């Protein structure tokens, strides 16, 4: 498999070639190659244990390198960069009756559709985050928003803080969401509860006196009863 340095050199050569032909440079909002590679290396051992027959079909080192390359690309392009996401995919993989290794695209779909210990995935967090941000004008405070579950409140409020402080791009926001989700899943796995959303109790409405119209009507009725109207 190509080293990180070689991958970077190839990327630079491609960018220079594009500029030479008056084409725009290409940038991908994705996790660092090193981080994705670390996650995949841990997954590789689990795949060998879950699908030993399929993994034995790799006859040469070249076959194995191509397999790694395709899976690494799929992970990097689809935002799979935490072990929480991979664990979610492996839970579904181990339930499969067929002993065949899933395709990279199929495994990525499993990672995204299955939540971890909280039953929530990154896509759901991002969707609820933007719904909250787009509807924030409807509520007095963030606590009043109808969160699907308390952990969404804690994650989204922290996401807003990080996004404002660091001016995150959409891809960076998704990665931060994955990191926060991973952190909360570890807390739950360790037996720590998710704090509830503490909504402030509304102050009692102040008693209001009669309106000017009511005062005039009362005066009219008094005058009428006294024969003055």
UniProtKB/Swiss-Prot annotation:
Belongs to the phage P protein family. It comes from the Viruses. Forms a (host) DnaB(6):helicase loader(5) complex in the presence of ssDNA. Its C-terminal half might bind to the gene 15 protein and its N-terminal half might bind in addition to bacterial replication functions. It comes from Enterobacteria phage phi80. May load (host) replicative DNA helicase DnaB onto single-stranded (ss)DNA at the origin of replication. This is Probable helicase loader. Pfam families: Phage_lambda_P (PF06992). GO terms for biological process: DNA replication initiation; viral DNA genome replication. InterPro entries: P-like (IPR009731). Keywords: DNA replication, Early protein, Host-virus interaction, Viral DNA replication.
